[in-house]
Amino acid sequence: MPSAKQRGSKGGHGAASPSEKGAHPSGGADDVAKKPPPAPQQPPPPPAPHPQQHPQQHPQNQAHGKGGHRGGGGGGGKSSSSSSASAAAAAAAASSSASCSRRLGRALNFLFYLALVAAAAFSGWCVHHVLEEVQQVRRSHQDFSRQREELGQGLQGVEQKVQSLQATFGTFESILRSSQHKQDLTEKAVKQGESEVSRISEVLQKLQNEILKDLSDGIHVVKDARERDFTSLENTVEERLTELTKSINDNIAIFTEVQKRSQKEINDMKAKVASLEESEGNKQDLKALKEAVKEIQTSAKSREWDMEALRSTLQTMESDIYTEVRELVSLKQEQQAFKEAADTERLALQALTEKLLRSEESVSRLPEEIRRLEEELRQLKSDSHGPKEDGGFRHSEAFEALQQKSQGLDSRLQHVEDGVLSMQVASARQTESLESLLSKSQEHEQRLAALQGRLEGLGSSEADQDGLASTVRSLGETQLVLYGDVEELKRSVGELPSTVESLQKVQEQVHTLLSQDQAQAARLPPQDFLDRLSSLDNLKASVSQVEADLKMLRTAVDSLVAYSVKIETNENNLESAKGLLDDLRNDLDRLFVKVEKIHEKV
């Protein structure tokens, strides 16, 4: 505020100086014209600048005073100019004071708004800080509630364990009560046995006394009888002796029976006493059990960890077993596909054998046709040696017949060539299929070896093992059947060389006939015979190719036989793996039983 007052005073003196120096009054009007219009919404200036107007009035008064002096000195003409200058100076002073007040109001408004913004920012920061603290309190409260829930769950588990321990102690107390009751019963039985033993001893004592009395009475009677009659004495002595012996025997029998009964009761008592000793041992066992329960409570946590580890291992073992079962199923499917491929190959071999039989039949018919050709050639020779008159006509007829026969032979040879070509194609297909079968068999061997290595440590279900064994056996049976078919094919191939030899003989005969009948062959078109010879050569080459293909088939069959032997070894390995799986299953059952016992103890 003092600075504002100083600024106002400086502005007042500055505005009054032109009037004192005699400045032109138009300067104030120009300044007033150059000033911008006031803002429409400018707030009213604060009342603080009002004291600044008092120092501004002094220059005006001074100006008026000076003007008065000047006017008084200069005359009436100068008084009007001085009044206008004073009015201009007053307007300039008023405009400068208004601009200063406006600037000061703007600065104060800016400071006020800046303070409001700072207060709002500070309040927002405080609210944000308070919200973060509230969130932290909520989080801590949630953590505390979670800890309370966990503690509640732990307390519930402890309560359950305490209840189970109470139940076990209740059972132990019931067992103790039953053992005490049995002990009371045994004590009562011991007392009863002692009373019976005392009663038996009393009875025996009475019997002894009675016997002694009888003996003493008998002795007295004998003494009296001696005096009376010796004969009657003997009779009475004998009677009394017999009676005494009977009574003694009866008493001895009774005594033995009583002794046996007493011995049985004593044995029963001994057994009961032993059971009582066992009950005392049970007390000691109960104490040991209490200590063991405490130890179990202390080691329960470690056992829980062990149980979790066992569960995890069992789950991993189950997952591995499931994967192995899936692999076994896939292997079973592949073996079924292999079986189907073997069946198809068997059918192809059967078709090939049928084609071979047909070719053999056609080849077996060739010698007859060649014989017919020889006969026709002989007839042609005989016709050629006949009279020359009918030679042209007969020659033409023979030539036509020979052409017809050659055409028939060509058709038959073409049929044979077609059969041989089909046999070649079938043999090529057979070799390709056998190669594919060999590759598949090698893959199966590798997979079986890998599966056997895995099955040494893991187990699978008996149904899958039985199914795998059955599939392997069926595959072995199909391979045996295929082996039989291939053996038949070998036999048929073994018969092929004889047919080739017969074809060679026929070819030689044809060559000889052609050499003998060169003149007749010169008349006939030789190109047909050359074609026939070339067809026979082609037939021979095709037959040799068939022999080579059949040799390849033999090697493939031998490899299949070796593969069947490998399959038998794989079956044996699978049986051994099955035994290992049974052992593993038994070990797993024992492990489960141990785990259940641990659960029961816990």
Curated annotation (Swiss-Prot):
Residues 53-64 have a biased composition (Low complexity). Residues 35-52 have a biased composition (Pro residues). It comes from Homo sapiens. It is found in: Endoplasmic reticulum membrane; Cell membrane; Cytoplasm, Cytoskeleton; Cytoplasm, Perinuclear region. Residues 1-106 are cytoplasmic. This is Cytoskeleton-associated protein 4. Residues 130-214, 256-460, 533-602 form a coiled coil. It is a single-pass type II membrane protein. GO terms for cellular component: azurophil granule membrane; cytoskeleton; endoplasmic reticulum; endoplasmic reticulum lumen; endoplasmic reticulum membrane; extracellular exosome; lamellar body; lipid droplet. Residues 128-602 are extracellular. The chain crosses the membrane at residues 107-127. Residues 1-83 are annotated as: Disordered. The keyword ATP-binding does not apply. Interacts with REEP5. The gene is CKAP4. A lipid is attached at C100 (S-palmitoyl cysteine). Keywords: Acetylation, Cell membrane, Coiled coil, Cytoplasm, Cytoskeleton, Endoplasmic reticulum, Lipoprotein, Membrane, Palmitate, Phosphoprotein, Signal-anchor, Transmembrane, Transmembrane helix. The modification Phosphoserine is found at S3, S17, S19, S232, S312. Mediates the anchoring of the endoplasmic reticulum to microtubules. It comes from the Eukaryota. Gene3D superfamilies: 1.10.287.1490. Its main location: endoplasmic reticulum. The modification N6-acetyllysine is found at K21. Reversibly palmitoylated. Palmitoylation at Cys-100 by ZDHHC2 is required for its trafficking from the ER to the plasma membrane and for its perinuclear localization. Palmitoylation by ZDHHC2 is also required for its function in APF-mediated antiproliferative signaling. Increased phosphorylation during mitosis prevents binding to microtubules. GO terms for molecular function: RNA binding.
